[in-house]
Amino acid sequence: NQDIDKFCMIGISKNKVVALFSNTMNSCESNGIKLGDVESKVKSEHKLLDYRRIKNTRYILNEKYYNLIKTKSSYITVFYDSFEDNKVVGIQIIGKKTEENMAEIYTSDESVTTSFENINRYLINEERSRRGLNMLSYDENATLCARAHSKDMRDQDYFSHTNLKNQSPFDRMIQYGINYQGAAENIAAGQTSAIFAHYALMNSEGHRVNILGNYRYIGVGVVFGGSSSMYLTQNFYR
């Protein structure tokens, strides 16, 4: 993914491609669904699942920013942009066996943390690049600040920009040595991957404004566990 305008991710298991995601290129494996299609077209042409089953547990699908479709060989997740006429903006394809053999819907592997954070940053910069905006540079202090807040939300079991010490995002950024002219914070919890977290935020007006805002630096911090299973914080500043 050196060329961010041709962004895609490929999942490989036992030397075989078992998963694919892209928000810039169409795939012949997407059952005819293409980027730019409208939600009504997808719904009229495909049968949508209303739950996702992992082992013996059913997870109800009640979010409006994506649909899940089952084909003979795969599960296709179609992501929409509610601020751009509900057009398809991302397509994830997971092989049927891979999806159905998953042990759990949430990861508990802390080694995945950095990948989750990196993917989230890549997705943000692709959104910005596509709109002619500057890409955000990785910032270590902002990343540490974001991770600390995600960890605190998990450990103290709350979900808020203001922590239990009554510190705002801006208080925390200053504490981590960030000198800013403008800053913002996004938080998310409960999503099963960096992709789902990204589109949840992009379909929320205030969070979207931050992602596409006038900033230069970003830090993303993710932790797993707790009552929401995953906590994500994004710190932006200039």
Q: Which residue stretches match the model-derived regions?
A:
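Short, surface-exposed glycine/acidic/tryptophan-bearing loops
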Residues: 3-8, 13-25, 147-191
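Amphipathic N-proximal alpha-helical interface segments
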Residues: 1-31, 58-108, 234-238
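A well-ordered secondary-structure block
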Residues: 21-75, 169-238
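Short, low-complexity, polar/charged sequence segments that are solvent-exposed and flexible
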Residues: 38-41, 97-99, 109-114, 155-156, ...
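Acidic, serine/threonine- and glycine-rich low-complexity intrinsically disordered segments
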Residues: 65, 82-84, 90-102, 110-130, ...
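Second-shell loop/turn segments in exported
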Residues: 26-33, 105-115, 129-139, 155-160, ...
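Short, well-ordered surface patches within globular domains
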Residues: 112-171, 214-218
